Amino acid sequence: MSENMAYECLKYSNENINRALEALRAGKMIQIYDSDSREGETDLVIPAKAVTYTDVKWMRKDAGGLICVAVDPVASKQLKLPFMADLVREASKTSDSLGEVVEKDGDLKYDAHSSFSLWVNHRDTRTGIPDIERALTIRKIGEITEESLSGNGVRFGNEFRTPGHVALLRAAEGLLDERMGQTELSVALARMAGITPAMVVCEMLDDDSGKALSKEKSKEYGKEHGLVFLEGREIVEAYLLWAGTDC
């Protein structure tokens, strides 16, 4: 089934999903809440290729969490993006101190492993931290993701350097069949929307409590700013439908 055909089917299944896909296709921000039983966090989410410095400022000021880019698993393989934990494990062979700090089974209370890969800056940036420079790095990540999925031979190191100020998240190979984090949920939505599956995610934090912004407060924020609010279960249900041969 083509992406457009699947999208037409989804129009009749979940209007909230439909609105989110329309927003993403237009390069607009949405909200994704994973679940009560996982992180219990809401992220601001926007396609990487659509990001401007005002979007980075928006996420920095109103969300406050890490500004990361979730990358499709197929593109991650093409670009040879490693998991950060694997890099540290390899480095720990010559450094006992690294072996002590690397992520171990049971360390994470919400999942089996983290999705962190490299932290990068685009080579055209200076320090890489200003909003306008992070926006450039993010857009270029979107572009190289698209190029890699188009079969073009690209070398990630020609465009980017590490360490940097934008964290890459490598989506699980099985996507939602394997892991249901914001990384996989946002990439699944990108696939359904037929856009480049490189998505910016940023956790929403609460200035008053010092914790993650509650689901209720996140929804209120979304209403005030005209954002579509999706829960992880909605995305999982829609993705299973999209991935099927018919609907």
From Swiss-Prot:
Top-tier EC class: lyase
Q: Which Gene3D superfamilies match?
A: DHBP synthase
Indicate whether Magnesium appears among the record's keywords.
yes
Q: Supply the alphabetized keyword list.
A: Lyase, Magnesium, Manganese, Metal-binding, Riboflavin biosynthesis
Q: Where does D-ribulose 5-phosphate bind?
A: R38, E39, D43, R179, M180, G181, Q182, T183, E203
Q: Where does Mg(2+) 1 bind?
A: E39
Record-listed Mg(2+) 2 binding positions: E39
Q: Name one GO cellular component term.
A: cytosol
**Entry GO MF terms:** 3,4-dihydroxy-2-butanone-4-phosphate synthase activity; magnesium ion binding; manganese ion binding
Which biological processes are named by the entry's GO terms? riboflavin biosynthetic process
Recorded superkingdom:
Archaea
**What EC numbers are recorded for this enzyme?**
4.1.99.12
Site note Essential for catalytic activity applies to H165, E203
Give the multimer and partner information: Homodimer.
Entry similarity comment: Belongs to the DHBP synthase family.
PANTHER family to which the protein is assigned, alphabetical: 3,4-DIHYDROXY-2-BUTANONE 4-PHOSPHATE SYNTHASE (PTHR21327:SF46), GTP CYCLOHYDROLASE II-RELATED (PTHR21327)
This protein's name: 3,4-dihydroxy-2-butanone 4-phosphate synthase
Name of the encoding gene:
ribB
